[in-house]
Amino acid sequence: MAYSATQSKSGYQAGVKDYRLTYYTPDYTPKDTDVLACFRVTPQPGVPPEEAGAAVAAESSTGTWTTVWTDLLTDLDRYKGRCYDIEPVPGEDNQYFCFVAYPLDLFEEGSVTNMLTSIVGNVFGFKALKALRLEDVRIPVAYLKTFQGPPHGIQVERDKLNKYGRPLLGCTIKPKLGLSAKNYGRAVYEALRGGLDFTKDDENINSQPFQRWRDRYLFVMEAVHKAQAETGEIKGHYLNVTAPTCEEMFKRAEFAKELGAPIIMHDYLTAGFTANTSLAKWCRDNGILLHIHRAMHAVIDRQKNHGIHFRVLAKCLRMSGGDHLHSGTVVGKLEGDRAITMGFVDLMRENYVEADRSRGIFFTQDWASMPGVMPVASGGIHVWHMPALVEIFGDDSVLQFGGGTLGHPWGNAPGATANRVALEACIQARNEGRDLAREGNDIIREAAKWSPELAAACELWKEIKFEFKAVDTL
């Protein structure tokens, strides 16, 4: 029986619902305009997967635990989420992929905040579920067209920088905390003069007592302009404008613009999607590139059976707006299986991506010509990784070496030069038809013969490896 025996004089039955009767609809064919979601569901013992999947659909759309008389005032069948398919997760006990379709009318136009509030806002605390993970979403073109997306995109960025045919090189200034503004600017100048395209604030450098944001901006932009004049190349530094309030964030962004900064930075998860979308629109209006850091992502996406997969967070960022997004390295110190990583990298920068379960892509995604986001590979990488990084990420990426630049035994500028020489050698070898995956080490050794900076870097980091099995696998 779907409800308790309690009868109501108002024409409905009160009591606890059996979600399967309303929200499990295996005969439903999703519409082109539906938002689709794939959840990895681990039901509590004794809860059938159909009930668990239906509960997810209900609690993330129109459902509540009991029947209420106001149900009679609307067309619930039009607005409800529907669990239309359930598959057991291969190799796992009591885990299921539950596919849910949501009508487009459930979501506010142009609001990632509202979309996530609906789909994942409340259901993750549901008692009938032992664990729940949002693996993927399909955003219909009709909904995508309500979002601006990235402020500029990959091609516009290349045109602004006048740099083509290779990945861009970056460096995070270290130590991330504790430097005075003047010493921080000095490190920026040396790295840019040595051959890098960008330097970067780390995610947690905002405006602390040892270095207030205005002082940092002034010294950093002095360094950028000086390095630019000396090298003849366009340079930039990701000035972090993340702030306690949106008003303060825009104040910092405006000051960066006044100083001639070509790019600013934002921590999109800790600051929130509302702030990020607002900043992305400001960046488009003001012609400034937007670098996005994913600080806090692993709190949300690291566990295999609970949370939100990063491919969903990456899709949300593309909709909310950002020109760069950190994506892991595959070969460095941070978590990342190659197939899974390249799956969400393609979702960041390609216009049309086919479903491919081997890469964790559950739905075909048409981005409807929305500009792409450039993936940023950073975290524990050095010159020996360069061939693999170029082979894995291709030209439309930023390769960011923090310790791999500033840890050079001769200093920041030689560290930057070593990375630039290694990159140029790999690009030339690739363009000549050489196999970077097979001949990468030989290519680096050959280049090191005529670059003492690269030779010193090769000697320093020849034994450094991060060999841990990736957690993020299907």
Curated annotation (Swiss-Prot):
Localization, UniProt: Carboxysome
Cofactor info, note text: Binds 1 Mg(2+) ion per subunit.
Principal subcellular localization: other
GO cellular component: carboxysome
EC number: 4.1.1.39
PROSITE patterns assigned: RUBISCO_LARGE (PS00157)
Needed cofactors: Mg(2+)
Active-site residue numbers: 174, 293
GO molecular function terms attached to this record: magnesium ion binding; monooxygenase activity; ribulose-bisphosphate carboxylase activity
First-tier enzyme category under EC: lyase
Binding annotation for substrate: 122, 172, 176, 294, 326, 378
Modified residues (N6-carboxylysine): 200
Entry annotated with the keyword Zinc: no
GO biological process: photorespiration; reductive pentose-phosphate cycle
Note from the entry: The basic functional RuBisCO is composed of a large chain homodimer in a 'head-to-tail' conformation. In form I RuBisCO this homodimer is arranged in a barrel-like tetramer with the small subunits forming a tetrameric 'cap' on each end of the 'barrel'.
Subunit structure: Heterohexadecamer of 8 large chains and 8 small chains; disulfide-linked. The disulfide link is formed within the large subunit homodimers.
NCBIfam families the UniProt entry points to: PRK04208.1
Function: RuBisCO catalyzes two reactions: the carboxylation of D-ribulose 1,5-bisphosphate, the primary event in carbon dioxide fixation, as well as the oxidative fragmentation of the pentose substrate in the photorespiration process. Both reactions occur simultaneously and in competition at the same active site.
HAMAP family documented for this protein: RuBisCO_L_type1 (MF_01338)
Cited PANTHER family: RIBULOSE BISPHOSPHATE CARBOXYLASE, RIBULOSE BISPHOSPHATE CARBOXYLASE LARGE CHAIN
Protein name as catalogued: Ribulose bisphosphate carboxylase large chain
